[in-house]
Amino acid sequence: MHKSEAPNEPEQLRKLFIGGLSFETTDESLREHFEQWGTLTDCVVMRDPNSKRSRGFGFVTYLSTDEVDAAMTARPHKVDGRVVEPKRAVSREDSSRPGAHLTVKKIFVGGIKEDTEEDHLREYFEQYGKIEVIEIMTDRGSGKKRGFAFVTFEDHDSVDKIVIQKYHTVNNHNSQVRKALSKQEMASVSGSQRERGGSGNYGSRGGFGNDNFGGRGGNFGGNRGGGGGFGNRGYGGDGYNGDGQLWWQPSLLGWNRGYGAGQGGGYGAGQGGGYGGGGQGGGYGGNGGYDGYNGGGSGFSGSGGNFGSSGGYNDFGNYNSQSSSNFGPMKGGNYGGGRNSGPYGGGYGGGSASSSSGYGGGRRF
């Protein structure tokens, strides 16, 4: 690659995760396929460091984000006779957030002000793809905006493209954007984590903050809600709103209120709890692993050596296992596949156990 061709965009935005690879696929055959849509600066099939057997996934990095977009537009892709699943690669920082590796079509948008209307959201977000639905949440009683909205897209890639970009400005206001997860999706995450956590610890390295998620009950919801379960109510009590109803069992991390519930709780408010809050790392997007390529349990290939074992790409705990010497932060933060140059050091897996409240709730939105 000539100096004049040096990439001028962040590597993370130019990288694709390629899942579902045939075990016969090599770096060369993967490159041969994906270079049809642009110049590749890197291409690798991840392999077991001992057996050298393919793990069934890899990464390709393009020279520009336009080429990434072109490759995603060309879906579906078939490599060596097998349909594969390309997705925008998630950074280590982002992989620690709830649902980071889930395929969803809806985003949560925080920081919505009173002067922000549906047209403002549409004007900004339609650059990422076709929008199906925009919902600005309002108070049932007063009709005032509650500070957040949901945007649903036609294609999950629009969501992936949005969330890997850190900053968004809607109607001249800074907005926080995350994937919006349904009750079922959050429950599937919690269930797989509990199965791997042994005694209710959340993640591969230690417990969930100072206590298990939901106090000392061990499971989501802890002692509240009849011995566990995924929280007791939906987004802040009854549905999206509520009058101070407890969403999670109170803990040292300040998860006192639900999604936008009364008395200052919810997303980014109140004692550091909720969505992106401060405090001791609580809230959506805390410090550590929630799902996907992080946590204990079996490795990516599982004992059977199949991609995703029995649960496909979202079999949360099959992507990384430090105890199984998979592609977590091993030597120098690399994937453990023998690559020490570092292009994958900021990728999937690793970190401490998460302290995230997530969306949770008993009602689907």
UniProtKB/Swiss-Prot annotation:
GO cellular component: a single term: catalytic step 2 spliceosome
Alphabetized UniProt keyword annotations: Cytoplasm, Nucleus, Repeat, Ribonucleoprotein, RNA-binding
Keyword Transcription part of the UniProt annotation: no
Functional note: This protein is a component of ribonucleosomes.
Location(s), subcellular: Nucleus; Cytoplasm
Chain intervals for the UniProt region annotation (Disordered): 175-208, 328-365
A single GO BP: mRNA splicing, via spliceosome
Pfam families: RRM_1 (PF00076)
Annotated segments matching region Globular B domain: 95-185
Biased composition (Gly residues): 198-208, 330-365
Any one GO molecular-function label of the UniProt entry: mRNA 3'-UTR binding
Name listed for the protein in its UniProt record: Heterogeneous nuclear ribonucleoproteins A1 homolog
RRM domain residues: 14-97, 105-184
Superkingdom of this protein's organism: Eukaryota
Globular A domain: annotated segments: 4-94
